[in-house]
Swiss-Prot record:
Pfam families: DFRP_C, zf-CCCH. Residues 1-13 have a biased composition (Low complexity). A zinc finger (C3H1-type) spans 100-127, 175-213. Residues 14-27, 65-74 have a biased composition (Basic and acidic residues). Residues 1-27, 51-74 are annotated as: Disordered. The gene is zc3h15. Interacts with drg1. This is Zinc finger CCCH domain-containing protein 15. Gene3D superfamilies: 6.20.400.10, Zinc finger, CCCH-type (4.10.1000.10). GO terms for biological process: cytoplasmic translation.
């Protein structure tokens, strides 16, 4: 590995260096400051200069300072020459007696050389010069205003005024026609019409009208009207309800059914009238708009005529057993048969609260299934003790005798599991 660099010695501060230089100057000029000789004073000056300038030759130092000063002077002269060449000469302004200096534009401000700012007695508004200057016969001041006056800032009245001014005289000379030029309408609709618009169809010699048709509405005006008329459904309903007034018929089920029945009858009557009208039109030879189904409804004899005019060749088509389908009579559903009515509660059964007790009785019967399956007597709470004793005296026993030694212990366990899992039907 390369040897590590020795740490840089800390640099002495400027004050420390200055003290060292003063110490050196005092040592070299010790005892000479109080002497008045020219040689001693010159020697002290040279020593002081050498120490402060870093032991440099005083001639070289003086020469470097002279060169630096000369370069600075040369730059100043060069800038002065450039300013004299390219900067226009500004003559001091004179204002006539009694005139307002603020009505005159500052000449230095026009050249970008005014350094007075707000303290300048002349005006710094460049528009004053254009307002006060004489009107030129070669420039029309209205051109700038017309260029800024575009169709975006016009309303419907302004548009009519511009059209009348621009095309009014030309429209009087043209042949009378009511057709509006399509280029004119496209320019207005696309917001391209203005003072300097020229018709692509021939300018002023276009044979069509360059005037707004009656009832014309601009797009932006139309959008505003649509926005104003656009109201919500809730507001519309409330508005219509308020317009009905207080003296109106209240809606009930009976009135609603009567209204619906009347509407259905009116609709059926209207359909019949339309069908009769179509039939009369068909008879008179006006078959336009008549469907094929209506043709056969109006003239059913056409069905038989079509069968007679058919080819003599007959085609048979038999379905296989797998493809054969049973065809049942199908009837169309007529929605007019269904009428809304109040629900009649007569004859409607309601579940009683006793259904819970019957459910408990059925569960008790299920518990007796185990006794019956094991050959025991079914428990009967309604049977009295006297009847049970009478059965024993007569020798009738309902239970089947079982030999307990017939089964071993394991067989009994399996039998008990089967009996518990066994579920018999009633």
């Amino acid at each position: 590995m390369p040897p590590k660099k020795a740490p840089a010695a800390p640099q002495a501060s400027k004050k420390t260096e200055q003290k060292k230089k003063e110490k050196i100057i005092e040592d070299k000029t010790f005892g000479l400051k109080n002497k008045k000789g020219a040689k001693q004073q010159k020697f002290i000056k040279n020593v002081t200069h050498q120490v402060k300038s870093g032991q440099q030759n005083p001639r070289l130092v003086a020469q470097a300072e002279g060169d630096k000063k000369n370069k600075k002077d040369d730059k100043m002269k060069e800038l002065q020459e450039l300013n004299d060449l390219f900067k226009p000469v500004v003559v001091a302004q004179k204002v006539s007696k009694g005139a307002d200096p603020k009505s005159v534009v500052c000449a230095f401000f026009k050249q970008g050389q005014c350094t007075k700012g707000d303290k300048c007695k002349f005006s710094h508004d460049l528009s004053l010069e254009r307002k006060c200057e004489k009107r030129s016969v070669y420039v029309d001041g209205r051109d700038d205003e017309l260029e800024k006056d575009t169709m975006e800032n016009w309303d419907e009245k302004k548009l009519e005024e511009v059209v009348n001014k621009k095309h009014g005289e030309a429209e009087k000379i043209k042949a009378k026609t009511q057709i509006v030029c399509k280029f004119f309408l496209e320019a207005i609709e696309n917001n391209k019409y203005g003072w300097f618009w020229v018709c692509p169809g021939g300018g002023d010699t276009c044979m069509y009208r360059h005037a707004l048709p009656p009832g014309f509405v601009l797009k932006k005006e139309k959008v505003k009207e649509d926005k104003d008329e656009d109201i919500s459904l809730e507001d519309l309903i409330e508005k219509e309800r308020a317009a009905l007034g207080p003296n109106v018929t209240r809606i009930t089920l009976e009135s609603f059914l009567q209204w619906k029945k009347r509407k259905r009858a009116d609709r059926i009557l209207k359909l019949e009238e339309e069908m009769e009208k179509r039939k009369e039109d068909f008879k008179s030879g006006k078959s336009l708009g008549v469907s094929g189904r209506e043709v056969f409804e109006f003239r059913p004899e056409l069905i038989n005529d079509d069968d007679e005019e058919a080819d003599d060749a007959s085609y048979t088509f038999e379905l296989e057993d797998s493809e054969a389908e049973e065809i049942d009579d199908v009837q169309d559903i007529d929605l007019s048969r269904y009428v809304l009515k109040d629900v009649d509660e007569t004859g409607i059964t309601v579940a009683s609260c006793e259904r819970f007790s019957s459910y408990v009785a059925s569960t008790e019967k299920d518990e007796n299934k185990l006794c019956v399956a094991s050959g025991g007597v079914m428990e009967n709470e309604n049977q009295s003790e006297e009847e049970q004793e009478g059965d024993l005296e007569n020798g009738f026993v309902d239970a089947v005798p079982v030999d307990e030694n017939l089964f071993t212990g394991e067989d009994m366990d399996e039998l008990e599991e089967e009996l518990y899992t066994l579920d018999l039907e009633k």
